[in-house]
């Protein structure tokens, strides 16, 4: 039997979705060398199909990498990939794929385009809503959390029991070596700053964190904002005239790891998530997490975070004050974090995916 993996993610800007796809592929590659994996899967022909403009590369042992076609973007998905993957089972891990492939499983990470249309422009909504509905009709849908399974089942008119869950993980970040020089370069004091890491997109809800900083009124304990173009962070002028904000811009993983390790707390005010990886990254480095009550975030963090309503800046301010009063993370808090981080594993998610694929592989090998 042939298994084809949609490698379009290797031609896209690296975000959480592309990271997920890359880590799952690498974990599958490792599992295919294990005797614990069914022979029907180990002996199958595995190929990662990529566009010619793929800029990222993976080092794989069991999965062949093959560039196909000449097109780019969605056109590559719908034409070049569909043609190259004909006759095999196709696995798409990054929200999109050929809508008319006859044997296709696609991981859709969340239902934002249906639940929060205010986050997107009309062109993006039109494309991704249409694609989601067509994929739900012609492919098998999987996702990354129980919350996203419930949401996708409702908006795509599917049975939740028919949507398997292959969760995210933050294991990859544990391999990151912190670069402590960033602390001095930013001019902050250990355990005397709060940290926000994320894009400027509406769902990340940076404005509520900025409002909480205004209410906190502690210029000596800044909010360090990592990610995105500084010139665009405050495009709605939400940060104008606010003291206690420090714009760090884009940083390396090592620099971010060092900030996690030295922050008073990591602030995660998201309005909507399909999973929520950054809090787990913070927990790896022993950083207390103050997170919104968005359903997927609570599912991910469980009892290892302090929570506030994403629309309530006063509640966030109070948690920030409490964290400053508590000081360093306690041993009990650290144990909860470690348990939560260990709960999610790329290998466990990849094994769940392979277990899902095994019945069809067994049938094919017996034919």
Predicted features and spans:
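Carbohydrate transferase catalytic cores enriched for Leloir-type hexosyltransferases
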Residues: 1-367
């Amino acid at each position: 039997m042939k298994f084809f993996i949609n490698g379009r993610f290797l031609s896209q800007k690296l975000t959480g979705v592309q990271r997920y796809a890359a880590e799952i592929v690498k974990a599958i590659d490792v599992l295919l060398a294990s005797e614990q994996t069914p022979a029907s899967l180990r002996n199958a022909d595995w190929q990662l199909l990529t566009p010619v403009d793929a800029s990222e590369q993976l080092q794989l042992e069991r999965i062949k990498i093959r560039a196909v076609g000449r097109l780019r973007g969605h056109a590559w998905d719908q034409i070049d990939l569909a043609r190259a993957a004909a006759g095999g089972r196709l696995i798409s891990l990054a929200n999109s794929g050929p809508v008319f492939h006859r044997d296709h499983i696609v991981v859709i990470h969340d239902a934002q385009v249906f639940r929060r249309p205010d986050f997107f422009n009309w062109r993006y909504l039109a494309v991704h809503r249409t694609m989601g509905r067509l994929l739900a009709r012609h492919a098998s849908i999987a996702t990354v959390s129980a919350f996203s399974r419930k949401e996708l089942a409702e908006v795509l008119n599917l049975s939740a029991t028919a949507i398997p869950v292959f969760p995210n993980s933050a294991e990859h970040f544990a391999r990151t070596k912190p670069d402590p020089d960033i602390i001095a370069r930013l001019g902050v004091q250990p355990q005397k700053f709060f940290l926000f890491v994320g894009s400027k997109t509406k769902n990340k809800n940076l404005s509520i964190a900025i409002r909480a900083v205004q209410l906190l009124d502690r210029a000596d304990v800044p909010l360090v904002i990592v990610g995105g173009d500084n010139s665009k962070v405050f495009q709605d002028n939400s940060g104008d005239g606010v003291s206690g904000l420090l714009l760090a811009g884009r940083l390396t993983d090592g620099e971010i790891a060092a900030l996690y390790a030295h922050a008073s707390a990591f602030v995660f005010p998201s309005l909507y998530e399909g999973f929520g990886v950054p809090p787990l990254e913070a927990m790896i480095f022993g950083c207390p997490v103050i997170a919104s009550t968005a359903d997927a975030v609570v599912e991910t963090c469980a009892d290892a975070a302090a929570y506030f309503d994403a629309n309530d800046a006063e509640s966030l301010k109070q948690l920030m004050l409490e964290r400053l009063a508590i000081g360093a993370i306690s041993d009990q808090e650290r144990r909860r974090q470690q348990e939560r981080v260990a709960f999610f594993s790329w290998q466990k998610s990849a094994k769940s995916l392979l277990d899902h694929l095994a019945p069809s592989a067994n049938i094919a090998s017996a034919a």
